[in-house]
Amino acid sequence: MIGIDIVSIARVEKCVKRFEMKFLERFLSPSEIVLCKDKTSSIAGFFALKEACSKALQVGIGKELSFLDIRISKSPKNAPLITLSKEKMDYFNIQSLSASISHDAGFAIAVVMVSSSNL
C-alpha cells in the first residue's frame, strides 16, 4: 500500500510558534526533534511522513497507531528512513517500509510505501 500527505509549512510554523515544544512532543520523539534542527520545513516533512505512513497502513493516527509508534531517522546520505515500534511492525505484519519527503512552494509532501502480507 501507498500513503501520501501534504502539509503547509506556514501552518506548521504557526503551531510551533504558538505551542513551542508541546506541539513537537505530541508527534516527534526526542531524537526526531534533534534531526529537525528547529527547521520548520523539516518538522512539516516529518509530520507529513507520519501521516502518510498511517494512511498507507489504512488506519490513520488513532487507536491502532500513534504518531510516536512511527519512527523517523536519516540514512548516511540524509534520506528519510521510517520504521515502527516492534509491536506495530508485528501487528501490521510489515515486511518493509520505504519513504520520501519533498519540499516546494511552501509545502512538505511525503510518500510511504508499505509491504505487508496483511494489506
Swiss-Prot record:
Keyword Lipid biosynthesis: yes
GO MF terms held by the record: holo-[acyl-carrier-protein] synthase activity; magnesium ion binding
Record Pfam families: ACPS
SUPFAM superfamilies reported in the protein's UniProt record: 4'-phosphopantetheinyl transferase (SSF56214)
Chemical reaction(s) catalysed: apo-[ACP] + CoA = holo-[ACP] + adenosine 3',5'-bisphosphate + H(+)
Gene3D superfamilies noted in UniProt: 4'-phosphopantetheinyl transferase domain
GO cellular component labels: cytoplasm
Listed GO biological process terms: fatty acid biosynthetic process
Function noted in UniProt: Transfers the 4'-phosphopantetheine moiety from coenzyme A to a Ser of acyl-carrier-protein.
Similarity section: Belongs to the P-Pant transferase superfamily. AcpS family.
The name this protein goes by in its record: Holo-[acyl-carrier-protein] synthase
The species this protein was found in: Helicobacter pylori (strain G27)
Gene: acpS
